[in-house]
Structures are given as C-alpha cells and as structure tokens.
Amino acid sequence: MFHNFHILSLSSYAYNLFFASAGMLSSLVMFFKFGLYELFIFTLFSVLFISFAWGKDIAMEGLSGYHNFFVMDGFKFGVILFVFSEFMFFFCIFCTFFDAALVPVHELGETWSPFGMHLVNPFGVPLLNTIILLSSGVTVTWAHHSLLSNKSCTNSMILTCLLAAYFTGIQLMEYMEASFSIADGVFGSIFYLSTGFHGIHVLCGGLFLAFNFLRLLKNHFNYNHHLGLEFAILYWHFVDVVWLFLFVFVYWWSY
C-alpha cells in the first residue's frame, strides 16, 4: 500500500542510546558527589559513538532515497522541538541564576556576586572565547552560503571545526585556572552548571559539524539538498546565542 512514511528497519540504537544517556546522567551525579570522572567520560563517549553510528544509518537511508519531502518535514519538526527543549533547559538555568542574583540571601552577604570570591575577568579569556565563537558562527554561515551558491565550502568548514576545538580547549584552561569550584556556594554551582553544559553542547555541536563535513567530502550534499548540514548550522547558531547570554550575565554582570 502506498504511503508517504518511511518504515524503519529494526534497530537497537534507540535502546542503546537510552541506556548510555541514563548511565551518563548517573555517572555525572557520581562525579559531582565523589569526584569519579572516569565513568562519566566513558558513558559520554558511548553516547557520542552511538549517536554517530545512528546518524550514519540515517544518512545512508537518505542516500538510498527513503527520505522524501514528507519525511524531511518530519525531521525539521523534530529538530525544532529538540532545539526548543534545549532552549527551555537553559531558560531554567538562567531562572535559577536570576533568582539567586536579584535577591541574594543573607548567607551570601546580601550581595551578588558573593562576597570574597575572585571571579574570572570577563574581558580576558571569556571575551576571547566570545570572539572565537562568534567568528565560528560567521565561518559556518559563509560555508552555508558557499554551498547554496554551488561553490566549495571546505575551507570555511575546516575553519569552523578548528574554532570549535579552540573554544573547548580555552574553556578547559579557564576551568583549570579558576580560583573557585562547583562546591563554592550557589555562584560556583550555577557558573559551572551553565558554562559546563554549554561546553558540552559546543563539543556535541562541533562533532555534529565535523560529521557533516565528512559527508560533504563524500559528496553527500549539493546546493539544494543538505538537510543534515542545515540542522548542524541551526544548532551551532543556538549555541552562539546561549553563549552571548552567558557572557553578558554570568561573566560580565556578575563581575
């Protein structure tokens, strides 16, 4: 019987990703509580590996002609819902931040940021990271417009991936040199929760871009059919916008 839906073949990726994600969240709690980071690193890479394997299968389905326009509309709606859920996640984090910052309690000295904390200078490493991330947004947009014009976008994609890796490296360096930890009161908790989860999103977004760059090298995309790359670019711009809010409020306004 003819229909517009693509009937999926049997796959264990959904179950594997569920258990790997549950293990990652559980190991994250253990890391916060006991400082055991090895299991978290293992489960994080398990999630990334399963996601790449699943994405490869989806890409092969598209190349085989199973993804008609009706199916692609479903993908678009799913990605919009996913980005909206990510937006709500960071919205909750910012609600927590403003609840603590606008009405600081007596235990914090009734001031924000808490008295006695040596914070990161926003016009040092954070400003550099802002320039790097915004530059990566420019280069990935350059790559997109080059592809739409049926031109080569290899150099701009390589530059975007390098900037993403550079941002992650500088963020790790900032954590190692910071004078406070996640256990230093409400500010330390919110700071590392917000910037840490954003860093994970940058890592995932950079890998997503790298995955699509490999597909680009294999000629999986053309100027009018590159949905996977568009999803990666949309996600990357979302990461850019979240960082701007983090820089303005968590770094600059709190300093």
Swiss-Prot record:
It is a multi-pass membrane protein. Keywords: Membrane, Mitochondrion, Mitochondrion inner membrane, Translocase, Transmembrane, Transmembrane helix. It comes from the Eukaryota. InterPro entries: Cyt_c/ubiquinol_Oxase_su3, Cyt_c_oxase_su3_dom, Cyt_c_oxidase-like_su3, Cyt_c_oxidase_su3-like_sf, Cyt_c_oxidase_su3_a-hlx. The chain crosses the membrane at residues 12-32, 34-54, 77-97, 123-143, 156-176, 190-210, 231-251. Gene3D superfamilies: 1.10.287.70, Cytochrome c oxidase, subunit III, four-helix bundle. It catalyses: 4 Fe(II)-[cytochrome c] + O2 + 8 H(+)(in) = 4 Fe(III)-[cytochrome c] + 2 H2O + 4 H(+)(out). SUPFAM superfamilies: Cytochrome c oxidase subunit III-like (SSF81452). GO terms for molecular function: cytochrome-c oxidase activity. CDD domains: Cyt_c_Oxidase_III (cd01665). Its EC number is 7.1.1.9. GO terms for biological process: mitochondrial electron transport, cytochrome c to oxygen. GO terms for cellular component: mitochondrial inner membrane; mitochondrion. The keyword DNA-binding does not apply. Its main location: mitochondrion. Belongs to the cytochrome c oxidase subunit 3 family. Component of the cytochrome c oxidase, the last enzyme in the mitochondrial electron transport chain which drives oxidative phosphorylation. The respiratory chain contains 3 multisubunit complexes succinate dehydrogenase (complex II, CII), ubiquinol-cytochrome c oxidoreductase (cytochrome b-c1 complex, complex III, CIII) and cytochrome c oxidase (complex IV, CIV), that cooperate to transfer electrons derived from NADH and succinate to molecular oxygen, creating an electrochemical gradient over the inner membrane that drives transmembrane transport and the ATP synthase. This is Cytochrome c oxidase subunit 3. It comes from Caenorhabditis elegans. The gene is ctc-3.
